[in-house]
Amino acid sequence: MESNKKLKVFVDCHVFDEGFQGIRTYIEGLYKELIKDDTKHFYFAAGNTQNLAAIFGHRKNVTFLKYHIHNKIFRLLAYMPWLILKHGINVAHFQYRVPPLKFCRYMVTIHDVLFEDYPQYFPKVSRKVSYYTYKISAKLSDVVFSVSPYASGTVTKHLGIKKVPVTPNGIDDVFFEPYDKASMRHKAAEKFRIKNYLLYISRWEPRKNQQLIIKAFYELKLYERYDLVFAGENTFANTEYDTYYNTLPDAVKQKVINLGRLSFTDMLLALRGARLFVYPSIAEGFGIPPLEAIAAGIPTISSNATAMADYTPFMGQWQFDPCNYNAFKEVLLKAANSPELIDSECLKKEIKTRYNWTLAAGVVKKYLNTVTK
């Protein structure tokens, strides 16, 4: 079938030019499944098309479009609509925000609207801009997706969209791959100068609750047995964490390591070398890191708040209320003392069944199959 007789689907991939992040994982996982459908032609657009080709491969039903405009606002307002017109696109898929000029059907995935339920964790101007641009984008779109039942419900509540299908994040196959734990721990120790460590991978911002871990780490005297390792980009200042950290004895500070932003390869190494993964976030639209840790066979404890309440049926006693410090300490101490009590292999099977890109792609494909040229 020739490409001009197929349904043409445009996918905005500008996030692939900005380094590793959750939205990139979502687009990559979703469309690696969807491009298997040869009845549709997919147009992936970004500044670095060589990077896109390395990720999605060369297929007859895939075209890579280069963004020659790097200004984000002009690109959204005019350049994307021009590309859509030029290539006769039937459906375009965006994340959070869509162009106001509309020349085809729009799909938008709004991953969360946490700034509405947890405004204290977001700058005021950012909240206002996000609210109005998300709301306008949702109204302009023919279908609005989200990534969890929790996020879907909040998009419905705050943006006034009656039906928000869920396209759940999947876990990349690389996390399920077998590996030698002793070897990974040795490599992590050599590369990062860390050993026998508790790990938290997440961006730095107040709602991520890093301060909860460091406080319990000190009060439970876990520094006598473990290092505490953080990894993630600094998004918003966490003054509560900084204030507490500065009060710690130097001997304890030496046991707290911040690796900062890591490449995917280094992140995977740090994860595989961990003794215990801890995820105390207060609010998430999905919350994928604890699932990735479980998939990698790492004993994991997690917050049970917001979207992470979906994990309770299989994580059970290894979850906690991130706003209840004593409850968190109890779960952390139990897991740190006996991480082998967490049945990682059983949990891994649950993750593989519940969170895979085939399920998410099926939801999007169902909508695409209703679209006529």
Model-derived features: where do they sit?
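Carbohydrate transferase catalytic cores enriched for Leloir-type hexosyltransferases
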Residues: E2-K373
